[in-house]
């Protein structure tokens, strides 16, 4: 027999969490000032009129370096709890962590060999 009243808290939470964003959009649409004009369509750079082309393209090299940084940064975050509890954990967890470290290292060596990390 299913007791549906056990899920009352879930349904209440679901309703409230659905209504709050909808209300936020409705209230902001009602209270926001409506302004139209040429200033609305101009680009804004810290209150200064942009000189030249405001949109520049970044080279893909910057994204490659950022991606490598993020991969190793996330890996460091995951390795910290392992390093703190290293003495309690067994050899199998050490091997798993070693594999976890070797996968990004092999990927970065591959990228380095292909020239993806060259700055020039």
Swiss-Prot record:
Species whose genome carries this gene: Nuphar advena
Listed GO CC annotations: chloroplast thylakoid membrane; NADH dehydrogenase complex
Record's subunit section: NDH is composed of at least 16 different subunits, 5 of which are encoded in the nucleus.
Catalytically driven reaction(s): a plastoquinone + NADH + (n+1) H(+)(in) = a plastoquinol + NAD(+) + n H(+)(out); a plastoquinone + NADPH + (n+1) H(+)(in) = a plastoquinol + NADP(+) + n H(+)(out)
Gene Ontology MF term list: NADH dehydrogenase (ubiquinone) activity; quinone binding
Keyword list, A-Z: Chloroplast, Membrane, NAD, NADP, Plastid, Plastoquinone, Quinone, Thylakoid, Translocase, Transmembrane, Transmembrane helix, Transport
Residue intervals passing through the bilayer: 9-29, 64-84, 88-108
Chief location category: plastid
Organismal lineage: Eukaryota, Viridiplantae, Streptophyta, Embryophyta, Tracheophyta
InterPro entries: NAD(P)H_OxRDtase_bac/plastid, NADH_UbQ/plastoQ_OxRdtase_su3, NDAH_ubi_oxred_su3_sf
Subcellular location: Plastid, Chloroplast thylakoid membrane
Superkingdom to which the source organism belongs: Eukaryota
This protein's name: NAD(P)H-quinone oxidoreductase subunit 3, chloroplastic
Principal EC category: translocase
Coiled-coil segments on the chain, per record: none
Protein's GO biological process: photosynthesis, light reaction
The protein's Enzyme Commission number: 7.1.1.-
A Pfam family annotated for this UniProt entry: Oxidored_q4
